[in-house]
Amino acid sequence: MATQETDDSLISTDVQTDATERGDQPDETVVETKHLDVHYGDEQALDDVSIDIPENKVTALIGPSGCGKSTFLRCINRMNDQIDACRVDGKVVFKGKNVYDDDVDPVALRRKIGQVFQTPNPFPKSIRENVVYGLEVQGEPASDEDVERALRGAALWDEVNNQLDSSGLDLSGGQQQRLCIARAIAPDPEVILMDEPTSALDPVAASKIEDLIDELVEDYTVIIVTHNMQQAARISDKTAVFLTGGNLVEFDDTTNIFENPEDDRVEDYITGKFG
């Protein structure tokens, strides 16, 4: 289990985490949002979202298109900084530190909170260079052991270990997405954000990613946006339901969300009455 760090941990200090068995220990919060509002110009994308994300669990974010799921995800590692006219109010607290404080380095933050996107986006570089990018951007040397560790962690090593100098673009779509996961875990983050990571993949490749997520959560916290409610029910421990207007309407154990939701709107969404 990760130990508590001082407030300057997001600026320069590396953090080690120990794998924990899912469900064996009480939930520890790794990311907390407090009254989080997001606007794109005059349009509000998130409205007063407060939530505690548990460590070493899979948390799924579900809801209809345009409800703020991806916006919420991008707030956690400040990817919204790259969007013009985006204004973030409230707090996103990671290990006791508001990530929007002026002294937080977004690049250092993204080393600790990695991200995998909807469409596989390997760089037009070799498999090896894709993996080590996350380390080299921090000015750190990358060893062959680092490459192997990340590729094994992404369940890709056995498929590519004889072609590390080949282009990552030559891989299949599912392999490219696992390469992107390897790139995300190479810097040894604590949290991995996934924005619909299987939506562009065929069912077989998507199933491999789901199996991989189940393995990753032994060492990392995973927060995943998905439109596939069956996927959310299969792979997640917690589920947050967002609805139109950027409102978080319910957050609970996934079993409770899908079998006994408290909010009628959540039941209507899950049963397909709207969405």
Curated annotation (Swiss-Prot):
The family this protein is said to belong to: Belongs to the ABC transporter superfamily. Phosphate importer (TC 3.A.1.7) family.
Spans through the membrane: none
Organism: Natronomonas pharaonis (strain ATCC 35678 / DSM 2160 / CIP 103997 / JCM 8858 / NBRC 14720 / NCIMB 2260 / Gabara) (Halobacterium pharaonis)
GO annotation, biological process: phosphate ion transmembrane transport
Keyword Nuclease: no
Pfam name, any one: ABC_tran
Residue segments, region Disordered: 1-26
Designated name of the protein: Phosphate import ATP-binding protein PstB 3
Polar residues bias: start-end ranges: 9-18
Residue ranges constituting the ABC transporter domain according to the UniProt record: 31-270
Domain of life of the native organism: Archaea
GO MF annotations, alphabetized: ATP binding; ATP hydrolysis activity; ATPase-coupled phosphate ion transmembrane transporter activity
Subcellular location: Cell membrane
EC numbers for this chain: 7.3.2.1
